[in-house]
Amino acid sequence: MLAAMIPVGTALQTTGLTDVISSSISVFAGDLSQFWLLFTILIVTMATTDIINNAATAVIMAPISAGIAIELGYPIEPFLMVVAVGASCAFLTPIGHQCNTVVMGPGNYKFTDYWRLGLPLDILIITVSIPMILFVWT
């Protein structure tokens, strides 16, 4: 999956699609504060990493996030850190990370068990990471 996503990420950058996506999002997000932009990017990244590999999510989301930061005149570092944190949080599905899939059978977990246990963890990470990222990288 990762081997297939790196060329996709490169193609998105080379063709300028990440710039188009970033500028389109920036038009709608221009009135939002940096906190809410980081919050939104973190949520989107967390949702994406629950479906595809975390490294592939980072390859896709990092240029988009950096483009939004550049378009709106914010420092890039907090936006990239939010992508890194969000891409590491595959707690809501058994398909988001291979470890989740491995423990599903022996633990007799159902798909809904991941939501029940992963959602509070995601909320905790959102609550702690955004203020810390703003504190450290702004």
Model-found features: residue ranges?
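Short helix-coil transition sites and intra-membrane helix breaks within transmembrane domains
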Residues: T10-G16, T48-I60, C89-Q98
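Small-residue-rich segments of transmembrane alpha-helices in multi-pass membrane proteins
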Residues: M1-G9, P63-G73, L117, I126
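Hydrophobic alpha-helical transmembrane segments of multi-pass integral membrane proteins
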Residues: D31-I68, L72, I76, A84
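Re-entrant/interfacial helical elements at transmembrane boundaries that shape
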Residues: D19-S24, A56-I68, L80, H97-N108
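Juxtamembrane and boundary regions of transmembrane helices in multi-pass small-molecule transporters
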Residues: A84-T138
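Core transmembrane alpha-helical segments of multi-pass membrane transporters/permeases
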Residues: M1-V20, F35-A47
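Alpha-helix N-cap/start motif
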Residues: I76-E77, F111
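Membrane interface segments of multi-pass transport proteins and intramembrane proteases
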Residues: I21-S33
